[in-house]
């Protein structure tokens, strides 16, 4: 039942974003898609599980600030134990030649499934990713993240995860409206 609720929520979020994207009708849109896999809660032998995730970033919404170049991100992950995390937040990107350092912070909704009980529906993911440019439109990366409810619940065990990711940037295309 929890997996059904998670998948329904995931569908509604992506449907909402796709409708809004069509309404915006941005002609020169750079979009970044990130697919990743790894180990959820690798530091807990009893509850570690493989994970698969997807993340989206609209490059047109980047903003230069005193913290660097910030942009909004939205994504979801699911574990082999049918736990899921649906999130949206912000990331910064720092380029050092072909090396990219990308910290991010994303509040989200965690669905336990048959996975680890993190103590609350609302969880916060802090992540640090290192990636290398493969070309001007793709990257290969490694990241570490921690998901925690910041003591919103009665318990707050947290989960430490690592992932390997592939990122692809779509370049602007001329749209026929």
Would you name each region that the model predicts?
Residues 102-124:
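Mid-chain, well-packed structural core segment of small domains
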Residues 167-173:
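Conserved small/polar residues in nucleotide/adenosyl-binding loops
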Residues 1-27:
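Cleavable N-terminal export/targeting peptides
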Residues 40-50, 76-87, 114-121, 151-159:
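Solvent-exposed loop/turn segments connecting transmembrane beta-strands
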């Amino acid at each position: 039942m929890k997996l059904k609720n998670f998948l329904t929520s995931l569908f509604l979020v992506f449907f909402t974003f796709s409708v809004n994207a069509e309404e915006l009708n941005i002609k020169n849109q750079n979009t970044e898609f990130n697919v990743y896999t790894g180990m959820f809660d690798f530091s807990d032998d009893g509850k570690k599980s493989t994970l698969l995730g997807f993340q989206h970033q609209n490059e047109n919404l980047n903003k230069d600030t005193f913290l660097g170049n910030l942009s909004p991100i939205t994504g979801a992950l699911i574990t082999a134990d049918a736990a899921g995390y649906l999130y949206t937040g912000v990331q910064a990107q720092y380029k050092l030649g072909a090396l990219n350092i990308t910290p991010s912070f994303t509040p989200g909704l965690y669905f336990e499934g048959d996975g680890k009980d993190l103590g609350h529906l609302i969880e916060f993911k802090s992540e640090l990713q290192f990636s290398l440019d493969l070309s001007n439109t793709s990257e290969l990366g490694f990241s570490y993240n921690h998901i925690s409810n910041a003591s919103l619940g009665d318990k707050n065990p947290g989960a430490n995860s690592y992932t390997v990711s592939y990122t692809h940037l779509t370049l602007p295309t001329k749209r026929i409206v």
